[in-house]
């Protein structure tokens, strides 16, 4: 039986039931299609795992005596709270909790499988009222409970085999909390240009909002919302012109890693690369020359990436760096075949053979590299979000090798210096800096921060 919280007695019963029990929370938002930054919280379905109690804590639903959402901060637990889509829930709740999808993904490389949890009532309701807003507030609460019960059962399948670790706790904090911070900032747009380029009207107070999917097979986040793929915005068709600064005295600023993967790999295998152009360094070894032509420099880039992603043959394995990479790939594959899993470098996330398909040594290495890239960047984003608190500028977009900022010119040159040092780790991972009045045709300004 589900208890719907309607008065103080019910509310105290909920709080006492949660005190020492792990629990599963499934928030339901008023509108099924709005970005969570522009949405409201209809109610929360709460399940206490120790005592198997079910609650509905309502805030806007028409079937219930709704509670003041400010009371949500009173609901805490000494047990672990697992929230469905915690990143979205961060707008409403700042208490300690963990992401239920991340828990499932940590074990299987997939988020909770909820494709079949919609009830017939949900499907019919969404067809009838697809042009209306906030329909979850008036879809019958009994139908919501039916759906939440299905969701809880899927969660419990993953919970039954999950082991909480310090690494998971840290990954949850770094990944969920930091990407929540980026999503909250949004991207300011020229409304006319944006609507023209994307045929979308998802603009709220002059901004559009991204949503990062953290549950990909390798861990590298994808980034889509409202039909727009923000991780792969076209550089040629002018669509990037629609992204502009929100500040009266502002511009967009992009910091882009230089030869990022090569340096990450060097760090993984413990190889010291010189503090020079990576492609020039390798090109001189490829072509046995002291001076590279422009054509040889471009060829050097292609050769390096072909070797790292396609496999290293015997001739190139004679170059010390690539010989070490080849040994690392071989050792990684042997461990994978022997134990049936490997762990990522920093957060020790397991990657099990049963969940990785058609694997081979180079593909496994690429999985490990992309996981390592993401874990490195989580530390970087966390450091950036801490550093940026004292400035007016905002971090507004992340891709695997670059960060985009809405730069307030009042922050001055010191912001650029602090930012460059934070992202590059004081030069360990060199970055290039570009700036512009919009996200299209940005100019290199790296030398101005030297």
Task: Cite the ranges covered by each PLM segment.
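Acidic, glycine-rich two-metal-ion catalytic cores of nucleic acid-processing enzymes
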Residues: 2-3, 26-67, 191-294, 345-388, ...
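Conserved DEDDh/DEDDy metal-dependent 3′-5′ exonuclease domain
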Residues: 2-13, 19-162, 259
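C-terminal polymerase-core module
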Residues: 311-318, 325-370, 406, 410-450
